[in-house]
Regions:
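The feature marks the mature, well-folded catalytic cores of soluble enzymes
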Residues: 1-196
């Protein structure tokens, strides 16, 4: 709620460039994920200031992991989430948001693939693509695993697990979301540049 606009990994470059253009700025602060910010910076001329925060799932992947996966699984296609460190994207075959990774698998149907992202994402894409062999070097997100159907049910029916947000914070957060939603809709999720 302390930002002017929010973004997703699908539209981060679009948001950075739109903000810079609208405010005639050559520098944008992109937080909290330093790796998404660094990977966005590689795709734009806008100077990006970042913060040393990271997703605890994606920051665990390394370029060495990619090398080991290629050695253990010859011919495997490596797809990386843009919140992975830049050196991972440099050795991956493709990088993009979760939607872009899912589209890649659906459209190109590689024989064998690795998704360098949270395990549940790989599970969902695998379920939609039964003809593709998924290698799963899983990193689990403990926070996402707390969101269960039972907890959602309890929240909706019984009012349990409710998170109360002060109205002033809600309004600022809504303004940041509204600013993002006002941007033109992208036709497809963004592909991130990779080194391969």
């Amino acid at each position: 709620a302390e930002c002017d606009i929010t973004c997703t990994s699908s539209n981060a470059v679009q948001v950075v460039e739109a903000v810079a253009k609208e405010w005639n700025a050559d520098t944008v602060i992109l937080v909290p994920d330093q790796y998404l910010a660094k990977n966005v910076a590689a795709m734009t001329d806008i100077r990006i200031m970042t913060w040393p925060g990271a997703c605890e799932v994606h920051e665990l992947f390394s370029a060495d992991d990619v090398d080991q996966l290629r050695e253990a699984h010859p011919g495997v296609v490596i797809l990386a989430h843009p919140e992975c460190p830049p050196d991972v994207l440099e050795v991956a075959d493709y990088a993009g948001s979760p939607a872009a990774l899912a589209n890649y698998v659906k459209e190109r149907t590689p024989a064998k693939v690795v998704l360098l992202t949270e395990c549940s994402m790989s599970d969902n894409v695998a379920a939609e693509n039964p003809g593709v062999d998924f290698v799963r070097p899983c990193n689990l997100c403990p926070h996402m695993k707390r969101i269960t159907l039972e907890n959602i049910y309890d929240c909706l029916v019984n009012g349990e697990h409710e998170v109360l947000i002060p109205e002033d914070v809600r309004l600022r957060a809504k303004a940041a979301l509204d600013a993002m939603m006002a941007l033109p809709k992208m036709e497809k999720p963004l592909d991130f540049e990779v080194g391969r």
